[in-house]
Amino acid sequence: MHKVMKILLIILAVVAVVAITTMLVLRHPAFGRKMSKERKARIEASPNYRDGMFQNEEPTPQFSRSMPAMLWDFITNPPKDRTPKEPLPAVKTDPKNLPTDCDWLVWFGHSSYLFCLNGKRYLVDPLLKMEFPASVMMKPFKGTDIYTPDDMPDIDVLIITHEHWDHLDYATLRDLREKVHHVICPLGVAEYLEYWHYDPTIITEMDWYEATNGITCLPTRHFSNRLLGGRNQTLWASFLVEEGGRKVYIGGDGGYDSRFGRVREQFGEVDMAILENGQYNTDWRYIHSTPEGLEQAILDLNAKAVFTVHHDKFALAKHPWSEPDSIARSIAERNAVKLLDQPIGTIIFF
């Protein structure tokens, strides 16, 4: 009996430690907070919020196979070459001293990039500082983490496409706060930013098809979930930025659907389309861009130039790390597409 009681006490102690640790971890600001009643009311009034959550425009299963089938495939077909053996080439540009009298883009790996359009500087989904808890989930490839928030200039517009950890980073946004003049984000995402001490007066939350100051919020085919907030309680989006007669399409994350053709119909030819390419899996084809979906999206948009993102920094899927670059080049060659294919940090004029 004494031994049984001792074992039970040990088990209870372990459970208590785990529970307390979990509670403390979830109190980290990166996890966000409960949404305000006012924000929740606006979300529930959205035509895209139905049956207790945001919905995609087309039916969107999260996975194309059952979870047991995916787990079995992962066990029997383990991924190979997910990370590079050598540091990736990257260029250390000084974003603070880049000109604003011409249009350019500098990519920081994955889906983080800074671009200038008609004198305005736009920063998209910056992930420039690996701190807990993001550092537990993602490890940057060697050579790809050469930029920090300190390297950034003043930002005219910060654009966040959705709440996922690889797009909405607490540590980066905390350190950028004093440099940001205006924030554009989908419905619900501002709850994080306000919790992280961003001035609510500089934040514009948008629903699909709303527009402000030359920026139109548009659909993508994805989802949201950041643990505490619940599934699909904040919106995900793509954006069309128009400035000085030029147009940039920010595709965000999402599986292929008819939206790319509709962007072309509504806005005409865009000067640059920035599209997701990487961290894909056939099991996720409804919520992430596959190589086949990327090619069709490029054809539907028929943009003057294409730049692909969501690769070359983290291994978040099974495919070889170098595959997205090869696929993009093959698509461009096959379809006579102008592909802006440059290493991290390169100044790309467009």
Give the predicted meaning of each segment.
Residues P126-L128, E163, T220-H222, G252-G254, ...:
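Active-site metal-binding loops of divalent metal-dependent hydrolases
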Residues F115, D125, H162, D169, ...:
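Divalent metal-coordination and catalytic microenvironments
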